[in-house]
Amino acid sequence: MAQDVLTDLSKVRNIGIMAHIDAGKTTTTERILFYTGVNHKIGETHDGASTTDWMEQEKERGITITSAAVTCFWENNQINIIDTPGHVDFTVEVERSLRVLDGAVAVFDGKEGVEPQSETVWRQADKYNVPRICFVNKMDKLGADFYFTVDTIVSRLGAKPLVMQLPIGAENDFIGVVDLLYMRSLVWPGDAKGDVTMGAKYEIREIPADLQEKAEEYRAALVETVAESSEELMEKYLEGEELTVDELKAGIRKMTINSELYPIFCGSAFKNRGVQPMLDAVVDYLPNPLDVPPMVGHDPRDEEKELTRKPSADEPFSALAFKIAAHPFFGQLTFIRVYSGHVEAGAQVVNSTKGKKERIGKLFQMHANKEMPVEGATAGHIYAAIGLKDTTTGDTLCDSANQIVLESMSFPEPVISVAIEPNTKGDQEKLSTAIQKLSAEDPTFQVSLNEDTGQTIIAGMGELHLDILVDRMRREFKVEANVGKPQVAYRETIKRAVERHDYTHKKQTGGSGQFAKIQIAIEPLDTAEGELYEFENKVTGGRVPREYIPSVDAGIQDALNDGVLAGYPVVGIKATLVDGAYHDVDSSEMAFKIAGRMAFKEAARKANPVLLEPLMDVEVRTPEEYMGEVIGDINSRRGQMQSMEDAQGVKVIRAHVPLSGMFGYIGDLRSKTQGRAVYSMTFNSYAEVPKAVADEIIQKSRGE
């Protein structure tokens, strides 16, 4: 079969491999690529040689950061795989991949069962209604326990597992699986090291006598569960008739696609055992693009008008950009999922999210970081495109005559920042290039400039996130720079109005001097309404000439960058110019700007200035036995409890906690809950800092 884009969409699977960090996700992907003939040599994560981990830091840290898209073939079916990261700081990558997948393989560590990050990723997959099959990996590991892992899938995820296989042997003696559908054994001969076929061949044998009874018990449970998928099967089952393998497969497929149950397989990807039956299951049970409901979007000219696109080549072209990656030769690669229609390489399309025309230069199907050029892109597939200049993550590309905006992905605001100081002018230029490219790739990475210190401030989703971004700047863009400690972004405001404050700026040093006299009033604005600054001019009778009034406004705005308490930006201010005086010769725009700046500074000191801090919405999911400790810990961080409720097998605690109290929280939470609790944090609002805490921050900022 020509391994090109298949036109029969029933033979296509767009899947993700999702798991907790270290459950063996990348190794599993490598084995899939090996058995499907894409790879000729198996790369190990712990050797730093795997196909999908292609960024330098991924190879070093042995974790997957960027989801690489890989295309492979199995039994005449095309499987497009997205490898997703399992670390909490990269949830944005995971959300992006899940958004464009039709199904997923959830990989679990056979010894650890469901781990905190497996839970986070599982909930994200629930959010996007992604059907899943499960692969219990590392069955060769000391202490591996298949039945324990299945129990944790029920207790921690509240999911309904359908056991499809039982392990034969355990730890070093793990040699294969019992296939409950066909009631037979699949055994991989030889030790992984001595087996020249690398697990590509397995033998079909009788079920071992010591497992026969257990296999019959699990097979009966499987048949009973699947009989519920339709009335015909239920009737047949109740009449005592045998259900055929094809009937069982059809029932399992239907229930998997509806997310009513999750088929469970087991193996050891590292020892090359159990991967092929899992690939068969991807084809047998996970949805193809035709099984997925039509995509819903809206008309860019009328947000209320709902539009849909079916996964057919006859519909108008529509696609979603879900990832931007920098490529060493092609520059920017934009990964797209085509939902409907067809587009040729070189065609002009519209980015309906931004209202801009774009030209698709070349199109590729990707094998990690190798590219296979294709002439056109068709519904149901994932491609990498080059030549798109204005398209960023979450944007829709579509046919200009039939425009649609597919629902975009929403990304959380960054919560932590560090200052970066380039060592030389050359480094400053490299830093600008790096920032431009990295922020195009990653919507949760933001950049600003500290006017006073001239430092570049970068903000992201967590400490590891910023570490990796800084590391990429150094490696990929050769930026040499000093990096500060993580900081909280405080603000300042006032609580009291000052009705009149006079200020005269006067300088006489021979020749023409400088003169400006103004009287201003200031009052607080409600920042919750988004009102950060307002200026009003109430001067009458030309006492301050009209051309100088914008200078007073500019001077006050200048003063807002640098508050009177600790030098943080000032928000929530209304300033009014009430009166003033000028001199025909000595007055100038600069004199009035200085007067505006100094008048505001003095007035602000009288207006009861206070410090504001970012308050975060923190949600912790913890097993009930750790609830007391978790709540006590939140209180010690100046947190305020908002609510508490039950979810599947866990307690969900919601609280408002100052960001300054959240540094190092992930480590503390792990140690208090044996790594079983997970948390998420999003920005809520700015709130006043209690006086004792504020005094400490102010003293520190003044170097006292």
UniProtKB/Swiss-Prot annotation:
Q: Could you tell me which Pfam families the record lists for this protein? A: EFG_C, EFG_III, EFG_IV, GTP_EFTU, GTP_EFTU_D2
UniProt keyword annotations, A-Z: Cytoplasm, Elongation factor, GTP-binding, Nucleotide-binding, Protein biosynthesis
Tell me yes or no: is Heme among this UniProt entry's keywords. Answer: no
| Main location class | cytoplasm
Localization, UniProt: Cytoplasm
Any idea where the tr-type G domain is?
10-290
For biological process, the GO terms are: ribosome disassembly
Single GO MF annotation: GTPase activity
Residues annotated as binding GTP are 19-26, 83-87, 137-140
InterPro entries according to UniProt: EFG_II (IPR041095), EFG_III (IPR009022), EFG_III/V (IPR035647), EFG_IV (IPR047872), EFG_V (IPR035649), EFG_V-like (IPR000640), EFTu-like_2 (IPR004161), G_TR_CS (IPR031157)
Q: Which GO terms describe its cellular component?
A: cytoplasm
Explain the purpose of this protein.
Catalyzes the GTP-dependent ribosomal translocation step during translation elongation. During this step, the ribosome changes from the pre-translocational (PRE) to the post-translocational (POST) state as the newly formed A-site-bound peptidyl-tRNA and P-site-bound deacylated tRNA move to the P and E sites, respectively. Catalyzes the coordinated movement of the two tRNA molecules, the mRNA and conformational changes in the ribosome.
NCBIfam families given in the database record? EF-G, PRK12740.1-5, small_GTP
Q: According to its UniProt record, which protein family does this protein belong to?
A: Belongs to the TRAFAC class translation factor GTPase superfamily. Classic translation factor GTPase family. EF-G/EF-2 subfamily.
Q: What is this protein called?
A: Elongation factor G
Organism this protein belongs to:
Pseudarthrobacter chlorophenolicus (strain ATCC 700700 / DSM 12829 / CIP 107037 / JCM 12360 / KCTC 9906 / NCIMB 13794 / A6) (Arthrobacter chlorophenolicus)
Give me the gene this protein comes from: fusA
